[in-house]
Structure formats: C-alpha cells, structure tokens
C-alpha cells in the first residue's frame, strides 16, 4: 500500500522519536519469514521492550538522521526490519538471535549502539549483554564480597587462636552488663 506524503511524515516522525530514545538498533533481513513467525516475533518484541517495525529504507534513513544511528544510514538497503531496544541495549540482539536460530532466513545486517556501527556478527555480543537486573546483581555481588572476605578472615583468626564462638560469648555477656 502506497503512503501519501502526510503518512510518510508520520512514519518518519514516529521512527525518529523511537530512534532518539533507543539504546541500540539492529536491522535484519526478513525475506522468507512467514506471517505467523513475524507475528510471534512482534509479540515477543512487545514483551521485551523492543520496537520492531518494517518501513521503507528511505524513510528509515530520514528518521535516523541526527541520532546515534545515523552512522548506519548508508547500510540500510534491501528488505529490512528494524529492531530498536527501548529498555535494555541487548534486548533487540537477544530477540533477533533467538528467532534466527529457528529461521535461517532472518539475518542481522546492521548492528549499531552508542553511535558506533558494528558488523552483523556483533549481534551475538549485543545479545550477551546482561539485563539490568543481572547487572545490578553482579554489582551487588562485587560490592558485598570484600565485607564477606573480611568476616571470614576475622572468623578464621578467632578459630586459629582457639577462641571462636566460645571466646565471643564472654565478651557478649560483658557487653550486656
């Protein structure tokens, strides 16, 4: 279906707004994917915070002008679907990688994050980025480990000197008095 000028302007404005807020972009060839597969991918994209859209490349090029994804403008050729990660940088990578496992016709062509253009093979790197929850758990573990090591060292010194828990009991009784 052909779009008139005002419809094209709306598509460009919507995509430009999404591109300005997105963390990463993956453009992938989708030729040969069935409607049911595309519907399933769109459903999962909505659930994972990925904006997924098929638009004409000329409209996509206009939409990414002035954003971090402008570096990818000359690579946007052929039948492409655009996956923008809105919540986590790796979400689009995980989505495309997962669906490419089940369908060899879905192939990443452009990977862009933070104003940098990467080869399509970097979709695996992007997919391996931790989610926000995973990153926070890693940070908490890193921050708590020194305190845990100190506590284990103090306990080991107490055990080595023969006191351990028995030596701590008189100190606790003295503190209560």
UniProtKB/Swiss-Prot annotation:
PANTHER family reported in the protein's UniProt record: 39S RIBOSOMAL PROTEIN L10, MITOCHONDRIAL
HAMAP family xrefs: Ribosomal_uL10 (MF_00362)
Family: Belongs to the universal ribosomal protein uL10 family.
InterPro entries: Ribosomal_uL10, Ribosomal_uL10-like_sf, Ribosomal_uL10_bac, Ribosomal_uL10_bac_type, Ribosomal_uL10_CS_bac
Molecular function via GO: large ribosomal subunit rRNA binding; structural constituent of ribosome
Keywords of the record: Ribonucleoprotein, Ribosomal protein, RNA-binding, rRNA-binding
Record note on quaternary structure: Part of the ribosomal stalk of the 50S ribosomal subunit. The N-terminus interacts with L11 and the large rRNA to form the base of the stalk. The C-terminus forms an elongated spine to which L12 dimers bind in a sequential fashion forming a multimeric L10(L12)X complex.
Biological source species: Xanthomonas campestris pv. campestris (strain ATCC 33913 / DSM 3586 / NCPPB 528 / LMG 568 / P 25)
One biological process term in Gene Ontology: translation
Protein name (record): Large ribosomal subunit protein uL10
GO CC term, one of those recorded: cytosolic large ribosomal subunit
Pfam families per UniProt: Ribosomal_L10 (PF00466)
Function per UniProt: Forms part of the ribosomal stalk, playing a central role in the interaction of the ribosome with GTP-bound translation factors.
